[in-house]
Structure formats: C-alpha cells, structure tokens
Design a protein with these regions (language model features):
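Patatin-like phospholipase
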Residues: 1-37, 45-256
Length: 256
C-alpha cells in the first residue's frame, strides 16, 4: 500500500514537518511517497534519503540564511541560492533522485513559461534549491535552459503528484493565517508575507479534502517566515498536533 505525504511550504515553519514525521513514525505510519514544495521539499528530500527527524532538525539549525558570503552579485535576488549547493551536497552526495529510499516529487515554478514543474528524476539538488528560492529574496535557479523558483508560488500544497498513485494521503500544512491587528502590518515585509499567506491558503484549502489525514498546526501563525530563533518550539508544535490528529482520526493506516 502506498501512503503519500504532502509537505507544504512555509519557511522555517517547515520545521513543524519534522515534528510531524517524528509523530507519524512513533505511530508506525511510514509514508512511501512524498510531495513537497519549498521548505516541505527540503524536509521531504531529507526524509526520502532516510535521515532521521533529529538529523533533519540539526540541518535546519545549522544552515546559514542571511550570511554576507551568500549575498548575490549580478543575480535577481539578495541571496545567491546556488551558494547553498555545497551544503546540500554533503547530505546528498549522489545528487540524484534514484539514490533516495522513498519516491519524492519536488514542486517548482518554471519562470520562463509561467507554469508548475514537478521534478522526480535526474539531478536532485538544483530542483531542491529552486523549490526553496523565495522570489525577490533568493535568486532563481538555472536548470538546463530554464529559470526555476519557489514551488509555493503556484502550488504550496502539491497533492496532484500523489493522487493517482497513493492509497492514502496525509497532508501537513504549516502556513496558517489568523486575524491580525493593523499595527502589525506597518512594514513592507509584513504586508508582503501576509498577502502571500492569504493567497497560498486560498488555493491550498481547496485541496485539503483530498487528504485522509490533514495536519494543520494553527499555532504556527505567530511565527515568521524566517523565524530561526524558535525552531525547537516549531518542531514541538508539529509533533504535538500530529499526535493529536492521529488519535482523533479513525482511519486505519497501513503500518509496518
């Protein structure tokens, strides 16, 4: 039986995916197919390569984001996404989907043609970097003759790759929204992030019904897109909410 796992984008809120995976495994639920966008693609790739939740969490704690040595020069972005290649190469030395232990689908956006592009074979790291290349902040990634960027632009909850091949689907959405006061929307970045989250949720919520189990850690709404200071809290929220949802859900998942 194939169990699919959808991992949404959400910046450092994506660390909640790691806690969710930990809870799933503790309940003997082991997804066989993973579809991820942006931060979800990164977590999904590590999980597909059989890294433990603890190892994935350690990666997120140590990866530098706003580092002077990674600023872009003559590229469309403040940070040069390609400079993260060596960081990922350490964990994915074969740099190929075929080396993974689980089936993985990475959602990106083809900027040249203005459409979704899902990668599931061939080189791994460049699609992974592209899926996480938040527009304007991180430079897009060149793959062959095209430019690719954050998959969340068009699909922040990529269920389509799993619909026809999985018997059961688990979805984890880590980009929730809640009502905010106007005083918290005084800066350009806050307005931009708010607008993006509203758009993402509007599109993603239409797909929630495709999931046999939906994990929606609502309390993540108080954490920012690049909130690296609260990684342990974010992880725990993902873990606890998943444990609660599994107990509530009556569906029997295939277990090892």
């Amino acid at each position: 039986m194939n169990i699919g796992l959808i991992l949404s984008g959400g910046g450092f809120r994506g660390v909640a995916h790691i806690g969710a995976i930990k809870a799933l495994e503790e309940n003997n639920i082991f997804p066989t197919h993973i579809s991820g966008s942006s931060a979800g693609a990164v977590v999904g790739a590590f999980y597909a390569a059989n890294y433990s939740p603890e190892e994935i969490l350690a990666f997120f704690k140590t990866i530098p984001i706003f580092n002077l040595g990674r600023y872009a020069h003559n590229k469309a972005g403040f940070i040069d996404t390609d400079k993260y290649y060596p960081d990922f190469k350490k964990y994915f030395p074969e740099d190929n989907f075929d080396a993974l232990q689980k089936k993985l689908f990475i959602t990106t956006v083809d900027l040249n043609h203005g459409e979704i592009k899902v990668f599931n074979k061939g080189e791994l790291i460049k699609p992974l970097l592209a899926s996480s290349a938040f527009p304007g902040l991180f430079s897009p990634v060149t793959i062959e003759d095209g430019l690719y960027a954050d998959g969340g632009i068009l699909d922040n909850f990529p269920v389509e790759p799993l619909k026809l091949i999985c018997n059961q689907i688990i979805g984890v959405y880590v980009d929730p929204i809640s009502e905010v006061e106007s005083m918290n929307l005084k800066h350009s970045l806050a307005i931009l992030e708010r607008a993006i989250k509203i758009n993402f949720l509007s599109d993603s919520s239409k797909k929630f019904s495709e999931c046999d189990l939906l994990i929606y850690p609502y309390h993540l709404n108080k954490y920012g897109l690049f909130d690296k200071n609260n990684i342990d809290e974010i992880y725990e929220i993902g873990y606890k909410v998943t444990q609660e949802k599994i107990k509530e859900n009556k569906l029997q998942f295939y277990t090892k």
